[in-house]
Design a protein with these regions (language model features):
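Conserved beta-strand-loop-alpha-helix hinge in the C-terminal portion
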Residues: 148-172
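Conserved ABC nucleotide-binding domain
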Residues: 52-70
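H-loop/switch region of ABC-family ATPase nucleotide-binding domains
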Residues: 128-129
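Walker B catalytic motif
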Residues: 96-97
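Helix N-cap at the start of a conserved alpha-helix in ABC-type nucleotide-binding domains
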Residues: 103-105
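ABC ATPase C-loop
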Residues: 84-85
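Q-loop/switch helix immediately C-terminal to the Walker
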Residues: 19-31
Length: 182
């Protein structure tokens, strides 16, 4: 788990609802380390968490002692994303991490994802059924059907893609029609 950071579809699964924001972040920050009988969160750590939360621009930096269960789904997902990237994993897995969010919040979490990935030079794999998001984010797009890769595109070809191109490619390769829910 030290080399993998992950954010799942359900905003409720990435955090401990009855714990505070800083307690959740402390657990994530200590992933892979021995835990002794010291203070739960030091002043230095608290300041580090405050600065990291400030970067999210959600007003959470002044709510470190707030229970995570009282936050919105988008706020929880943003914290989960931050927690997953605290230890700079070799791979950040984003498994439909915006599917349970409203469009405005999903867009904000995607922008935060892009920012965190870029600033920390992380390798990320985002699983999504949203074709627009698949095209707009990342530098490579892999389309799968029934457990196998049916399309793999990157570079200029990916930049020039449209949703209609992906749907046509799916129909061509799979022999079926794609039910687009977006």
């Amino acid at each position: 788990a030290l080399f993998l950071g992950r954010v799942f579809q359900d905003p409720m699964t990435g955090t401990a609802a009855t714990m505070s924001i800083e307690e959740n972040m402390a657990i994530a920050a200590r992933r892979g380390q021995k835990r002794g009988l010291g203070w739960g969160v030091t002043k230095k750590e608290r300041e580090h968490y405050r600065e990291a939360l400030k970067e999210l621009d959600l007003g959470l930096e002044d709510r470190l002692s707030s229970k995570v269960g009282l936050l919105s789904g988008g706020q929880r997902q943003a914290i989960t994303l931050l927690m997953a990237s605290l230890k700079k994993p070799k791979l950040l897995l984003l498994d439909e991490h915006t599917a349970a969010l409203d469009p405005k919040t999903a867009a904000k979490v995607l922008a935060l994802s892009d920012k965190i990935i870029s600033e920390n030079n992380l390798t990320a794999m985002m699983v999504t059924h949203n074709m627009k998001d698949a095209i707009a984010h990342g530098n490579r797009l892999i389309m799968m059907h029934e457990g196998r890769v049916i399309y793999d595109v990157s570079g200029e070809e990916k930049k020039n893609l449209k949703v209609s191109d992906l749907l046509a490619k799916f129909e061509e390769v799979s022999g079926g029609e794609f039910a687009n829910d977006r």
